Structures are given as C-alpha cells and as structure tokens.
Amino acid sequence: MEGISALEKNVAELTVMDVYDIASAVGQEFERVIDQYGCEVIGRLMPKVVRVLEILEVLVSRNHINPEMEELRLELDRLRLERMDRIEKEKKHQKELELVEDVWRGEAQDLLNQIAQLQEENKQLVSNLSQKDINLTEEEFQKHEGMSERERQVMKKLKEVVDKQRDEIRAKDRELVLKNEDVEALQQQQSRLMKINHDLRHRVTVVEAQGKALIEQKVELEAYLQTKEQEAASMRLEIGKLRDKLKGEQHTNGEEIKTETLNEESILETEKLSLDLKDSNRPRFTLQELRDVLHERNELKAKVFMLQEELAYYKSEEADEEHKLPQSSPVIDSKAPIPQESGIKRLFSFFSRDKKRMPMMQKNVHFQESFGQWTEYNRDDVYTEQGQEALQHM
C-alpha cells in the first residue's frame, strides 16, 4: 500500500498526510499553470481549492476520531441495556420471592391449623377411651388375630397378582414396541419397493421404445433388401429379352457373322455385368460389404435378444411385486405386465442378481470372439455359402 498515491486510495483509508500530499500535487499543477499562463488564470480558483482541501482535512481528521467515539458510544449503550435488563430481572426475582413467601406462609398457617385440629381430636379420643371400659375376652382377641392373618394372606395374594399383571403389562409393552418397529420397517420396505417398481416401469417403457425402434429398423432393412431383389429380378428379365432379340436378328452373310460375334461378346459382357444369379460362385458383394452387413445383423440380433430378455425379466418382477403387494402403489397407473415363459429366459435370466448376470456377459464375449475369428478367417476373397445364405435371408 506504500506505492499507491493518495489520489488512488479508498476514501475510507485517507489520512491527514494523504490530504497534504493531495494539496502538494494540486500546488504543483497550479505552479505549472502559472508558469505557462500567468497568475490571473487561477486567481479566483485557488482560494476555492484551498477551502476544499481544508474541509477535506477536517473531515478526514473527524473520520479518524469518530470510530473510537462511536465504539465507546455503542459500548455505553450496551452497558446501559445490560444494567436495565439486570434491574428488570432483579425486580422480577423479587416479585417471585414475595409470591413464594406468601404461598409458604399460607401453607404454614394451614399446617398449623391442621396440627391444632389433630391435637384436639387426639385429646377427645383419649378422653373417650378413658371413659369406656373395654374388656376384650381371649377368644375375641384370637379371633381378631385370625382375621388379621387372613387379611395379610389376602393382601399377599393380591400383591402377587398385581406384580404378575405388572410384568405381563411390561412384556406386552415390549412386544408392542417391537411390533411398531416391525411396522415401520415394513412401511420403509413398502416405500422402497414402490420406488423400485416405479423405476422398473420407467425402464420397461424405455426398453419397449428401444425394441420398437429396433423392429422398425429391421423392417426398413427388409424392405431395402426386397427392393434390391426386385431390381436384380428386373435386370434378369431385361437380359433375357436382349438375348432373345439378338438371336432373332442373325443374318446369313459375313456381316451377319461379324455382327453375331459382336453381339455375343456384348451379351457376355452384359451377363458379366448383370451377375448370373444361378451361379453359386458369383461375386454378389465385396468381402468388406459382406462383413459389414453380417456384423450389423449380428449386433442387431444381440440387441434385440438382450432387450427381450430384460423386458421379460422386468415384467416378471413387476408381476411378482404386484402379487406380493397388491395395494402398495395406488398412485401409479400402468398396464398389467404379461408374464412370459421361455427356455431362453430360464437359461439366461441374468438381470436378477450378479450371479445370474455373469453367464450372459460371458456368452456375449464368446459371441464377439467367435465373430472376430470368423472375420480373421475370411480375409481373402472367398465367399462362404453361410455368408451368402445370410445375405439372402436378411
């Protein structure tokens, strides 16, 4: 901060020395103007600038003093508020003490009155006993003792019954707590299953959409292949018509022989170009095109297979959950899944657990390795019958 000039500082950080630096800089500028234009140019401006600098000096000095004064004023206000709060608390405490003392005095007076009343009753009972002549016989005394013994036994039995009932109540309370915990756990499990069911239904919808897209792609490929087959059939018909036409136009002279030779050569070239479909060794496509088509076909079949298995698994899981919890998800409305049973599903239900997921992954790896070995084996220009049949059936 030492390299920053006074004019570049923040207003809150200015000091009196910074004001003097500003005044010095302004004075230097005035000297340059005076040297260049004379004193008359700034004669009226200089007193105003000096006054502004004096005001700035006073304000800066106040700003340095005012924070301390403001802090002291705030501290004084805080102490006053604390003192007032303390006085209020003391007054409140004093009132509470007075109320407690009044209550205590009232209770003490009531107790004294009760003691006096009991003393009077005691004196009256003593006087009554002294006046009466109570002569209890021995039989009455034994009878009284027997009654007391029976009462003690009854009280003991009642106490045992009460203790037993208390233990049963405590056991019932513990069972009730456990039942409540089980109910809470079941409710949490129900909410979790509802969430899983919602996610599975969403995934089933996505899988169905993917399956529809793949089916549409398959239909488009089949239509494309049918158009190609129709084009090949039309080319065969044109070749047959050209051949019949050339055979009907043969002549007996030498020019006719030359023309026939030329026609036969053109027919051979046309036949070579049109590709005889009866020849099993005809070059229908290049090797790279054959590989690309077979690879794409196998990928699509694998995707369709995996999507069908996943869809069947999700539908079966949804059916099981709805069978276990028929009223678990009243908010979500969706179509009831149709359970599908197939041998492939029983063999490759790999989406349920991690143990079932591994065989399918190994099968996909084996399929990719076998397809890679087939492409490595067919690197030359030989066309196998299996590849040709696959192209014809696509």
Swiss-Prot record:
Where are the coiled-coil regions? 68-312
Annotated stretches, region: Disordered = 318-337
A single Pfam family it belongs to is RH1
Q: Which InterPro entries match?
A: DZIP_RILPL, RH1, RH2, RILP_dimer
PROSITE patterns (UniProt xref): RH1, RH2
Q: Which UniProt keywords apply?
A: Cell projection, Cilium, Coiled coil, Cytoplasm, Cytoskeleton, Protein transport, Transport
From the Swiss-Prot or TrEMBL record, state where the protein is found: Cytoplasm, Cytosol; Cytoplasm, Cytoskeleton, Microtubule organizing center, Centrosome; Cell projection, Cilium
Q: Which family does it belong to?
A: Belongs to the RILPL family.
Q: Which PANTHER family match?
A: RILP-LIKE PROTEIN 1, ZINC FINGER PROTEIN DZIP1
Q: What is this protein called?
A: RILP-like protein 1
UniProt source species: Xenopus tropicalis
- Gene that this sequence comes from: rilpl1
